[in-house]
């Protein structure tokens, strides 16, 4: 009797070519995100069919917005909860660092609130760039933690070199959008450009181009230090993380084209973190499984982690249903408005990203 075929390594699956763990996890995260959006789409069409046409009477303004907001807020709350209960926060110094970063996030929120009425397009672009650089930094972390990077190559310099490409792409996109806004003031007869008003002054366009040029020069310098053979060899060496970035940028552009917003990237970021941590827990379970339902069980086991995430997200959705159906989304209910209002979501996101700096 012949022996059974050897199982494939968990780091690789065959789909026309070998996928790395980083790529496979990203695909799984995208699939989970798509499923969540599909659920919110079903709820949205049911609510619209029931005559709930006003936004304050629905659970979400639209499927992508609702999926990103409810899942995103649950992620932000859990990130703080995990941080607050971690061992490294038992000393005073980490809390001081947290307070400083929280204050910095609050200042950025004030700046965003001041810019939003003056130029909502620019505010939205800066918000997207800030979050996407945060997401790309985390993808680099996944890349190394998954063991997909070449052995012995992990260094702060390499991590910086790998984080610059998405920054370049995003700042470049911002520059193109800024140029379009400038043209909008001079070519009002072009429908697409007309929608981008108010225009930006030429000084901002020039400043953006200078930032792009400086960032490109810095990245090329870092790449040459890591890979003397050039940019193409550097990209080939670290293909998994570059492919993930291409997929992420595609999601961003698709979201902009379909909804005019940048919300799906937040949902994708959350599902990427969920898949990454869940896989880490599944492969390295604790030696002694904690009691089911305990905080230790939810924090250290794959099953508990899944229950915690799903439970909190569903609790927030339930709160949103109560706010919309019982109170018609009244802004006078401060607790609901601060936590669940779609206008509050960018501020929660900015705080989360800023507090995560240097993690």
Question: For the regions a protein language model found, what residue spans apply to each?
Answer:
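Central hydrophobic cores of alpha-helical transmembrane segments in multi-pass inner-membrane proteins
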Residues: 12, 63-86, 133-141
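C-terminal transmembrane-bundle signature of multipass membrane proteins
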Residues: 245-359
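Alpha-helical transmembrane segments
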Residues: 26-41, 101-108, 167-172
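Loop-centered beta-sheet repeat module
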Residues: 167-245
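Membrane-helix interface motif
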Residues: 44-54, 175-193, 320-331
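Hydrophobic core segments of alpha-helical transmembrane domains in multi-pass membrane proteins
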Residues: 65-75, 121-133, 207-211, 259-274, ...
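Membrane-interface helix-loop-helix junctions at boundaries between adjacent transmembrane segments
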Residues: 96, 107-202
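N-terminal signal-anchor module of multipass membrane proteins
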Residues: 2-74, 345-348, 353, 357-358
């Amino acid at each position: 009797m012949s022996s059974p075929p050897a199982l494939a390594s968990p780091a690789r699956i065959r789909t026309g070519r070998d996928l790395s763990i980083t790529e496979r996890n990203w695909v799984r995260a995208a699939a989970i995100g798509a499923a969540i959006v599909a659920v919110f789409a079903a709820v949205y069409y049911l609510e619209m069919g029931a005559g709930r046409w006003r936004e304050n009477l629905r659970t979400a303004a639209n499927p992508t917005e609702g999926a990103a907001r409810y899942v995103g807020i649950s992620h932000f709350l859990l990130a703080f909860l995990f941080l607050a209960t971690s061992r490294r926060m038992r000393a005073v110094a980490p809390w001081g660092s947290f307070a400083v970063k929280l204050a910095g996030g609050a200042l950025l929120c004030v700046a965003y609130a001041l810019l939003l009425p003056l130029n909502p397009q620019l505010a939205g672009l800066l918000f997207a760039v800030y979050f996407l650089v945060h997401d790309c930094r985390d993808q680099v972390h996944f890349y190394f933690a998954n063991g997909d990077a070449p052995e012995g190559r992990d260094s702060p310099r390499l991590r910086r070199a790998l984080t610059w490409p998405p920054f370049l792409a995003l700042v470049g996109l911002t520059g193109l959008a800024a140029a379009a806004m400038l043209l909008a003031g001079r070519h009002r007869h072009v429908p697409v450009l007309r929608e981008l008003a108010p225009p930006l002054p030429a000084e901002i366009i020039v400043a953006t181009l200078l930032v792009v040029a400086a960032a490109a020069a810095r990245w090329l310098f870092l790449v040459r230090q890591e890979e003397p053979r050039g940019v193409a060899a550097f990209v080939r060496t670290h293909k998994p993380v570059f492919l993930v970035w291409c997929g992420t940028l595609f999601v961003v552009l698709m979201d902009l084209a379909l909804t005019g917003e940048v919300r799906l990237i937040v949902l994708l970021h959350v599902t990427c973190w969920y898949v990454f941590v869940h896989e880490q827990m599944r492969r390295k379970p604790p030696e002694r499984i904690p009691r089911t339902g305990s905080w230790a069980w939810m924090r250290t086991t794959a099953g508990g982690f899944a229950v915690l995430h799903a439970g909190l997200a569903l609790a927030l959705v339930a709160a949103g249903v109560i706010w919309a159906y019982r109170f018609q989304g009244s802004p006078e209910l401060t607790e609901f408005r601060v936590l669940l209002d779609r206008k509050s979501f960018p501020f929660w996101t900015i705080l989360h990203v800023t507090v995560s700096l240097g993690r």
